[in-house]
Amino acid sequence: MTARTFDIRETRDKDLLRELLASDPVAAAYLLGDLVEPFFRQCRWLVASAGGARRLEGAVLVYTGLSVPAVLSFGAPDAVEAVLAYFARELPEMCYAKFPLEHADAFPKFFQLDYMERLWVMGLAAENLQRPTQLREALQLSKSTPIEPIIALYTDYPGNYFEPSQLESGAYFGAYAEGQLVAIAGTHVLAPAEGVAVLGNIVTKSAARQHGYATACTARLVEALAAQGCSTIALQVAADNAAAISCYRRLGFRFQEVVWQTRATRL
């Protein structure tokens, strides 16, 4: 098969980017979230189109709003590899990279990958939420919610990133048992203007697992996000976390794709 040739460039054209990403909004939820401010101004969008067409075939997002940049990819594998090759010297020297399984051949050509964490991407049309008939109570958290119990709960889960300012979005719910916070669910991406949200920071206190607390928090969160205009709800979960995957399936989430998450050093 003859290799395709691409027109490779950097773009700030949101309409072009949105057209590409909307082809799979669950898989592209993180990238769609970065089309809104203040995140958009902290992004470089490196893209490829084929055959003289204006329509994009692939994109690599370099997000510089963190102390360590993040690199994400979306689109046709050959287009993404062409973008990485063209901008090879402009890629971050060190970054967190997240890319779908189909791009796993391209990234090692340009980065040394320190580890590989396999994640499932799952998605739900908010209108298809399967709300359990027997659902525990979960409360919306706000900036007036005492912060110490939240921080204490996340202390046992160091992989989660939480800042108190995130509570201002109204996109966090908590469940309590005997007055103690035992579960919480929040968001990594909240972009009603793009119709998407990505759930995250979902944890349950070890002693309270298997009692429906996280299910309640997640269900109430999805309902709140839908009310804000987020019709597509996505999440990413460790591929070996069977308990969490089962919880999300019961709520109506379905598997979409596998992505790899890694810390990467440019070659």
Each PLM stretch: what is its role?
Residues 98-104, 235-245, 261-267:
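Conserved beta-strand-loop-alpha-helix junction that forms the acyl-donor binding cleft
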Residues 114-125, 236, 249, 254-267:
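Conserved catalytic-core motifs of GNAT/GCN5-like acyltransferases
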Residues 51-52, 63-135:
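Acyl-donor-binding surface of acyltransferase catalytic domains
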Residues 63-64, 161-171, 176-203:
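A conserved beta-strand-loop-helix scaffold within acyl/acetyltransferase catalytic domains
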Residues 77-87, 204, 210-227, 232, ...:
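Conserved acetyl-CoA-binding loop-helix of GNAT-fold acetyltransferases
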Residues 1-29, 120, 125-160:
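Short amphipathic alpha-helix that is part of the acyltransferase structural core
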Residues 2-8, 19-21, 25, 29-87, ...:
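Conserved donor-binding loop and adjoining core beta-sheet/short helix segment
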